[in-house]
């Protein structure tokens, strides 16, 4: 492989929930663009995958906005927000030799948010 491209949509490209429809449509467009680019760039040995992060708020949010922090921790089925190393693991996988036959996917890292 010569390279890897990773657009960054979000979980709202897979599910609407409470965000405005234009936000979800834009994120869904990135996911579709990932698939399209993967098909057309694969012959050139370029992989294209996306990662859709769920809630990964900064830890300082817990002190500044405790009500929002509590809400974000209740939304995912895992009942907690993500931590940076968990998102980094997905990025490292897609950038590593372990995923040289993976292209055109959208990998949600969201604690199960988009599973329901």
Show the residue positions of the predicted features.
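Short, small/polar-rich loop/turn modules that mediate ligand/substrate recognition or access, typified
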Residues: 42, 47, 102-104
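Short-chain dehydrogenase/reductase
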Residues: 34-35, 88-91, 95
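Conserved SDR Rossmann-fold cofactor-binding beta-strand/turn motif
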Residues: 47-57, 95, 108-110
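A conserved structural motif in NAD(P)-dependent oxidoreductases
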Residues: 76-87, 98
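Conserved internal alpha-helix within the Rossmann fold of NAD(P)-dependent oxidoreductases
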Residues: 4, 30-31, 80, 84, ...
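A glycine/serine/threonine-rich, flexible loop-to-helix segment
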Residues: 9-16, 43, 53-76, 86, ...
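Short C-terminal tail/terminal secondary-structure segment
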Residues: 14-16, 92, 103-116
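Catalytic loop of short-chain dehydrogenase/reductase
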Residues: 1-29, 34-43, 55
